[in-house]
């Protein structure tokens, strides 16, 4: 997109929101759409704010289902919901990962068209904290939960991938065993990919160079991606090493297209990884679903890391956008890329036509007195739409999307079915702002 006027494009595509969710009194910092069959037969929304409040939303009635206050009122960074066990992981700025279970004795399906007088009665849903552990959150990084490859019939086992407790340039991998007692093991401690790449002289990286802290995690199939402060992205998977007779980390992806700018967000769609930074572009990497088996490796047994000797820097394609400082990114269906910038603007970009189709902002509606001798009152707009609007738009604290979905009509009354279909037939962009509101926007 060269030679266009950013201001004209963004103003021309400005779109009003369809719905607003109001409950939070502080800035939204985390959003996630999940499936929770024990609660609702349609997807629900999780939201968290910078004062430790967590809300589960009914997206059909646009009302809270249940809410909870994290002890210490600590800024919520990220969620992860494990549907099979009704367990919710919440990472907070006080460097604690808290694990909650939805009380099975109180679960029931929600009547999606209940009366107004019943709408806020959420006592039937209870969250029980079953564990908490320290995690380094200096960088506001998220975390990854993935199911173990070989679960047993007696319990369910998961891997937790997160920043190392003390060194936020490295990671830890825990094994979480959910049984009657809830067990935690740490088979990988302080995995240091920057040190490994320097030792192997990969890309001629100087041993004195700094990767900085890990900014974001993402997962695509069995590959975990780390986005660093210096713009590098590395991807690895856990494989069994015959020589060591144990699992080790195998590097399968390295890229540095955002260097030296920090990775601000990553998302996955199909077999593609998307990343963003302070640049005015998104990088897109196509990741093979079935990685080829290698016979020759570079390795460091002390670090428990290896990589194929044929590994090279991945070559991405770039999607140029009329925004910089892109803090949030998501993908909808095959065509639409949704991005939010530090300016408070969110755009829907059609990758097939290379056009911005929608722009969402929440304005503070501040009048600014001009210094001009003409003495006019303006809304602060200028030639640079993004920079001029930065102080006049509410900042985006979190953004996520919900794709259209099929509806099972069995057992639903006509009114229920109509309201669910109104949600299910559309793609949605959900944006949480610093004033505590959450906007629902049809795409």
From Swiss-Prot:
Keywords: Chromatin regulator, Nucleus, Repeat, WD repeat. It comes from the Eukaryota. It is found in: Nucleus. One of its GO terms (biological process) is chromatin organization. Its main location: nucleus. WD repeats lie at residues 23-67, 71-110, 258-295, 318-359. InterPro entries: WD40/YVTN_repeat-like_dom_sf (IPR015943), WD40_repeat_dom_sf (IPR036322). Residues 378-391 have a biased composition (Low complexity). One of its GO terms (cellular component) is nucleus. Residues 372-391 are annotated as: Disordered. Gene3D superfamilies: YVTN repeat-like/Quinoprotein amine dehydrogenase. SUPFAM superfamilies: WD40 repeat-like (SSF50978). Belongs to the WD repeat ASA1 family. Component of the ASTRA chromatin remodeling machinery complex composed of at least RVB1, RVB2, TRA1, TEL2, TTI1 and TTI2. Component of the ASTRA complex involved in chromatin remodeling. This is ASTRA-associated protein 1.
């Amino acid at each position: 997109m060269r030679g266009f006027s950013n201001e004209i494009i963004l103003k021309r595509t400005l779109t009003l929101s369809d719905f607003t969710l109001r409950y939070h009194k502080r800035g939204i910092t985390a959003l996630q759409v999940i499936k929770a069959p024990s609660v609702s037969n349609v997807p629900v929304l999780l939201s968290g704010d910078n004062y430790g409040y967590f809300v589960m939303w009914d997206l059909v009635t646009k009302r809270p289902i249940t809410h909870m206050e994290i002890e210490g009122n600590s800024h919520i960074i990220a969620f992860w919901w494990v549907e099979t066990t009704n367990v919710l992981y919440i990472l907070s700025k006080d460097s604690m990962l808290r694990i909650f279970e939805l009380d099975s004795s109180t679960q029931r399906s929600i009547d999606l068209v209940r009366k107004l007088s019943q709408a806020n009665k959420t006592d039937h849903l209870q969250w029980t904290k079953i564990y908490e552990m320290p995690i380094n959150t200096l960088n506001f990084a998220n975390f990854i939960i993935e199911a173990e490859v070989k679960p047993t019939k007696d319990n369910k086992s998961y891997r937790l991938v997160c920043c190392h407790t003390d060194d936020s340039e490295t990671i830890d991998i825990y094994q979480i065993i959910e049984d009657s007692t809830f067990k935690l093991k740490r088979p990988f401690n302080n995995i240091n990919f920057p040190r490994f790449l320097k030792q192997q002289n990969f890309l001629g990286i100087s041993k004195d160079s700094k990767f900085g802290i890990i900014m974001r995690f993402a997962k695509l199939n069995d590959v975990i991606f780390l986005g660093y402060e210096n713009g590098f992205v590395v991807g690895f998977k856990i494989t069994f090493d015959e020589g060591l007779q144990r699992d080790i980390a195998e590097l399968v992806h390295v890229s540095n297209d955002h260097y030296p700018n920090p990775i601000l967000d990553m998302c996955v769609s199909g077999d593609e990884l998307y990343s963003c930074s302070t640049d005015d572009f998104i990088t897109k990497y196509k990741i093979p679903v079935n990685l080829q088996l290698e016979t020759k490796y570079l390795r460091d047994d002390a670090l428990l890391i290896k990589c194929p000797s044929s590994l090279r820097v991945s070559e991405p394609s770039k999607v140029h956008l009329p925004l910089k400082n892109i803090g949030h990114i998501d993908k909808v269906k095959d065509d639409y890329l949704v991005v939010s910038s530090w300016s408070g603007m969110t755009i829907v970009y059609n990758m097939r036509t290379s056009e911005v189709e929608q722009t969402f902002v929440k304005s503070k509606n501040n009048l600014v007195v001009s210094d001009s001798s003409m003495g006019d009152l303006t809304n602060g707009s200028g030639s640079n739409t993004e920079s001029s609007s930065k102080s006049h738009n509410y900042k985006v604290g979190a953004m996520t999307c919900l794709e259209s979905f099929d509806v099972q009509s069995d057992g639903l009354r006509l009114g229920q079915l109509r309201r669910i279909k109104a949600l299910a037939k559309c793609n949605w962009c959900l944006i949480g702002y610093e004033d505590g509101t959450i906007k629902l926007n049809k795409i």
